[in-house]
């Protein structure tokens, strides 16, 4: 079975970090787990060190894309999952995604919100580049080949207001990588006032213009 690396970037969300890390540790298949402390000023360091993970990286604050890239650079897995520190995944998330590994390069699942919302989202089964231009077709926590990150240049570290995952999927599908989504709610997205999505929505037009200008 191909090795999977789960990257957990964290910045000042120590209160939620245990949920994310435990959901990674509890996967039904073995995974490499890497926590990236993106210059947190709270007790993230203390909390992170309570867990036995494969790698713990501490870096200067550079934003979510920078933290993801730092973790992926150190990852040894053929497949990568970025799991934000305020979210979590079902125990069989990786196992179910890997069933599609021979046919697809990016594999996502349905999304169940929790916290300030209980909305659920399912996505188009096989979205294309054209679909991604219209709207983001998968969530930020989707399994992908490390080869994609190496080919398209990683996450854009200039994007600090959000949509960095949408931008990443846009560039990946433009490069010809194929996407599949599983119609099951295996990703749990914590909705709260500090969510990056809330910030991104406020800057939607300028972010869209920036993303499309790079294509």
What are these model-predicted stretches?
Residues 23, 37-46, 84:
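A conserved acidic beta->alpha catalytic loop
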Residues 59-75:
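Glycine-rich, basic loop-to-helix element that forms the pyrophosphate-binding segment
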Residues 18, 42-50, 88, 92:
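Acidic helix N-cap motif at the loop->helix transition within catalytic regions
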Residues 22-31:
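Short, acidic, metal-binding catalytic loop of nucleotide-sugar glycosyltransferases
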Residues 92-121:
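Conserved donor NDP-sugar-binding/catalytic core segment of glycosyltransferases
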Residues 110, 158, 179-186:
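Catalytic beta-strand/loop signature of glycosyltransferases that borders the donor
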Residues 161-168:
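Acidic donor-binding loop at a coil-to-helix junction in glycosyltransferase catalytic cores
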Residues 80:
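Short aromatic/hydrophobic "clamp" motif used to bind/position activated sugar donors
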């Amino acid at each position: 079975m191909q090795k999977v690396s789960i990257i957990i970037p964290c910045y000042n969300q120590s209160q939620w970090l245990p949920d994310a890390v435990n959901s990674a540790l509890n996967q039904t298949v073995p995974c490499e787990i890497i926590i990236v402390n993106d210059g947190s000023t709270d007790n993230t360091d203390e909390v992170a060190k309570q867990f036995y993970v494969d790698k713990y990286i501490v870096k200067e604050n550079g934003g979510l894309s920078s933290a993801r890239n730092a973790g992926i650079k150190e990852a040894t897995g053929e497949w990568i999952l970025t799991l934000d520190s305020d979210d979590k995944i079902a125990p069989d998330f990786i196992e179910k995604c890997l069933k599609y590994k021979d046919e697809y390069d990016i594999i996502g699942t349905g999304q169940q919100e929790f916290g300030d919302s209980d909305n659920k989202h399912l996505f188009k089964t096989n979205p294309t580049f054209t679909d991604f231009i219209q709207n983001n077709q998968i969530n930020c926590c989707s399994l992908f080949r490390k080869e994609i990150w190496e080919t398209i240049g990683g996450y854009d570290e200039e994007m600090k207001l959000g949509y960095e995952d949408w931008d990443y999927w846009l560039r990946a599908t433009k490069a010809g990588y194929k996407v599949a989504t599983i119609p099951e709610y295996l990703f749990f997205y914590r909705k709260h006032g500090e969510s990056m999505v809330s910030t991104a929505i406020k800057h939607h037009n300028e972010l869209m213009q920036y993303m499309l200008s790079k294509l």
